[in-house]
């Protein structure tokens, strides 16, 4: 066991700082690593050499500011990560490496009445297929990220009440999936994970406050305040789908009337077009028809956009992201 404050523990901490900096940035020159981590150029050079020798990073020549430099990035062989996303009617699994490359992915429909155990069994099967198809070394799997459409208690990992996945409330999906796969699993609300992705690699890079809006079977927001995901004590922060737009509006699945979700979610808006476009109309077809100029679909999509805009405006006035 390493003694805190010892040379070996300090060295490991410096290794982790360098790997984290490169992982978040995608690639950095050694000078940029030194500035980002606060380590000396000599320390960075030694660590990069060590990481290169064990196959964790790759070093390639580049040109920075007109001078020759070496760009450091994580090796595709450094480790494997898996993403699992559960929705109201779908399961999606992606397998990738630490170099930000997606190696394989698969989506399949999911019965809305399926229990958590049934859904996780399906996820285990899909993960096994992707591992077999890609031939990756299971020993290199670093972990799994699991997204679910409901509030997660951070302390216990328990999924709160959710009508999007009604058979999942009260379960601990990360613990259960970890037991099936034998690797660490991190679980969070899907909108929170979307916000984190934008913060680290997307439109939110370089900002400290943002709101990520997800519209699917429900409507939710992932909130980042001062660079950190804000969940609230019960993990329900960002449930903008239940902002009241019309007290006399349609009854929502939450029991209230006129929630934003009742004017935007597919289960509520598609029936508006059933008489003119058939009961088998899908969300994808409605959007396609709207793009092609169909008057009814254009009207419904326009109304959805206006209602979402009202909800987002309220959120922006409150938080100023």
Where in this protein do the model-derived segments appear?
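Short, acidic, Ser/Thr-enriched surface-loop or helix-capping motifs
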Residues: 97, 154, 224
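Short, intrinsically disordered, charge-biased short linear motifs at domain edges
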Residues: 236-245
């Amino acid at each position: 066991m390493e003694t805190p404050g010892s040379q070996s523990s300090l060295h490991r901490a410096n290794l982790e700082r360098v790997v984290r900096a490169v992982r978040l940035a995608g690639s950095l020159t050694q000078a940029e690593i030194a500035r980002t981590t606060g380590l000396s150029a000599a320390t960075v050079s030694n660590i990069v050499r060590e990481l290169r020798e064990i196959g964790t990073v790759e070093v390639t020549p580049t040109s920075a500011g007109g001078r020759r430099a070496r760009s450091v990035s994580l090796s595709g062989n450094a480790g494997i990560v898996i993403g699992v996303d559960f929705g109201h009617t779908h399961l999606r699994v992606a397998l990738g490496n630490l170099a930000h490359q997606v190696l394989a992915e698969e989506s399949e429909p999911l019965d809305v009445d399926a229990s958590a155990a049934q859904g996780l069994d399906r996820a285990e099967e899909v993960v096994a297929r992707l591992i077999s198809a890609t031939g990756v070394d299971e020993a290199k799997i670093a972990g799994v990220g699991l997204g679910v459409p409901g509030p997660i208690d951070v302390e216990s990992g328990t999924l709160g009440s959710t009508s999007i996945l009604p058979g999942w409330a009260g379960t601990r999906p990360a613990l259960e999936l970890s037991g099936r796969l034998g690797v660490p699993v991190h679980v969070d609300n899907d909108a929170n994970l979307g916000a984190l992705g934008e913060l680290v690699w997307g439109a939110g890079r370089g900002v400290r406050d943002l709101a990520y809006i997800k519209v699917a079977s429900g409507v939710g927001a992932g909130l980042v305040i001062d660079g950190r995901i804000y969940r609230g004590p019960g993990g329900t922060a960002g449930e903008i789908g239940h902002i009241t737009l019309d007290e006399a509006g349609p009854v929502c699945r939450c029991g209230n009337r006129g929630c934003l979700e009742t004017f935007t979610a597919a289960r509520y808006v598609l029936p508006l077009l059933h008489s003119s476009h058939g009961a088998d109309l899908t969300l994808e077809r409605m959007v396609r028809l709207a793009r092609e100029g169909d008057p009814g679909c254009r009207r419904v999509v326009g109304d959805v956009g206006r209602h979402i805009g009202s909800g987002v405006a309220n959120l922006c006035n409150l938080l100023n992201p």
